[in-house]
């Protein structure tokens, strides 16, 4: 909370806010102001883990909107080519900022875009804690056993607009009521 309120005792000394948190001590390398730019950074961290013979997995979180950015595909390629311990996690809430996924991306299964690079993965209900937990365990076990990346697409629900300044008027009332929103695990 100190970081979010701009205090010096925050993990980024109060300068990161909600988008640019960073803590090397906690191995949290934060968000990024450019959509999808954290993905190659996460692959670089995975490379460092492999290079140093560390038994660690780099976790890279990205939204469905980032899945149409070129650097994401470049990162998938290198993660697979170099067999890096990286877990890619897509939060698919059906909107990249204010654009519906149907207007910006061909195909329904975003995780399948990584399969062309030989990355195994799956799509799960991101609103179900147990489903997410089971998928994370499968991913961890696969990465540790095979020394290869894995991808999980989590279908979830966006309860509000993209940010405080986004009233979400591009969504119909039906989208707010169907499917029935549940507590999200993300």
Functional labels for PLM-detected ranges:
Residues 1-9, 49, 94, 136-147:
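Structural signal for hydrophobic packing residues in well-ordered secondary-structure cores
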Residues 1-82, 100-106, 111, 116-118:
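Cofactor-binding active-site loop characterized by glycine-rich and histidine/acidic residues
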Residues 25, 62-68, 90-96, 127-131, ...:
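Acidic, glycine-rich active-site loops and adjacent beta-strand->loop/helix elements
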Residues 82, 97-144:
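Ligand/cofactor pocket segment of small-molecule handling proteins
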Residues 84-88:
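A glycine-rich helix N-cap at a beta->alpha junction
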Residues 91-92, 113-120, 163-172:
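Short acidic (Asp/Glu) and glycine-rich catalytic loops that position anionic groups and cofactors
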Residues 130-167:
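Structural signature of the thiamine diphosphate
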Residues 176-183:
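Conserved small/polar residues in nucleotide/adenosyl-binding loops
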């Amino acid at each position: 909370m100190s970081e979010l309120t701009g205090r010096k005792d925050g993990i980024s000394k109060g300068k990161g806010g909600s988008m640019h948190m960073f803590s090397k001590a906690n191995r949290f390398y934060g968000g990024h102001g450019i959509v999808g730019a954290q993905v190659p950074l996460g692959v670089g961290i995975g490379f460092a883990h492999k290079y140093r013979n560390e038994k660690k997995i780099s976790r890279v979180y990205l939204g469905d909107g980032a899945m149409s950015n070129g650097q994401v595909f470049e990162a998938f390629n290198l993660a697979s080519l170099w067999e890096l311990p990286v877990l890619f996690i897509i939060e698919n809430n059906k909107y990249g900022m204010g654009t519906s996924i149907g207007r910006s991306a061909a195909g329904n299964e975003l995780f399948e875009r990584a399969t062309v690079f030989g990355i195994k993965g799956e799509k799960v209900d991101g609103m179900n804690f147990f489903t997410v937990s089971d998928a994370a365990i499968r991913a961890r076990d696969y990465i540790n056993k095979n020394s290869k990346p894995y991808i999980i697409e989590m279908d979830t629900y966006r309860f509000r607009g993209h940010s405080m300044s986004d009233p979400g008027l591009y969504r119909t009332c039906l989208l707010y009521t169907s499917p029935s929103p549940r507590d999200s695990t993300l």
